[in-house]
Design a protein with these regions (language model features):
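Solvent-exposed, non-transmembrane regions of membrane-associated and secreted proteins
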Residues: 1-178
Length: 178
């Protein structure tokens, strides 16, 4: 009985958190990833990045023009955050030396990282921070790993800025790594 109450309490807390994020940041209005839209709502995105920057759960914006991706990403991972937008899973803030790892669900071409498997070597990925600084990364490789393999997070030159994107391969439960 206690377990069920605890589970319900956590579920209710997570739902309230999701509702709060959606109402405070209106994330669904901001997404411009539909095929009919060529507009990137950068003014809206940058206004949410600048608002309450000390407690802002949004760390930045990820843009991948080659596959029409333009999303805010959360400063930290949680199951609730990941339902709403990509999340920083590991590493430094954008523009810092190290490997910033961003997770995004694969919603089969509807949103988030559905098409990262289509990226090619040298495709550009841009991260924007809350000061509107842009940090440019270029795809070095796209590959799959077993869903329990976290080695791509740690496999990088410690003296450079790296970005690793991770999403699910919805066919065989592997992870797609960029």
């Amino acid at each position: 009985m206690f377990y069920l109450f605890f589970y319900w309490q956590n579920l209710h807390r997570d739902e309230l958190y999701s509702d709060s994020l959606l109402s405070n940041y209106n994330l669904t209005r901001l997404y411009a990833n539909s095929e009919s839209s060529n507009t990137l709502y950068s003014n809206d995105f940058f206004s949410i990045l600048n608002a309450n920057s000390n407690d802002n759960p949004i760390l930045g914006i990820i843009e991948i023009k080659a596959i029409n991706v333009y999303y805010p990403f959360f400063a930290y991972y949680s199951d609730e955050n990941l339902k709403l937008s990509p999340c920083k899973f590991f590493g430094p803030e954008p523009g810092k030396v190290g490997n910033i790892c961003i997770l995004g669900h694969n919603y089969n071409n509807d949103k988030f990282f559905s098409n990262v498997n289509l990226l090619k070597v040298n495709d550009e990925i841009v991260l924007y921070d809350n000061l509107q600084n842009s940090f440019h990364y270029f795809v070095e490789k796209v590959y799959e790993v077993n869903n329990s393999d976290f080695s791509p997070i740690y496999d990088y030159d410690k003296n450079r800025m790296f970005l690793t994107l991770i999403t699910c391969n919805n066919v065989n439960n592997n992870r797609i790594i960029v």
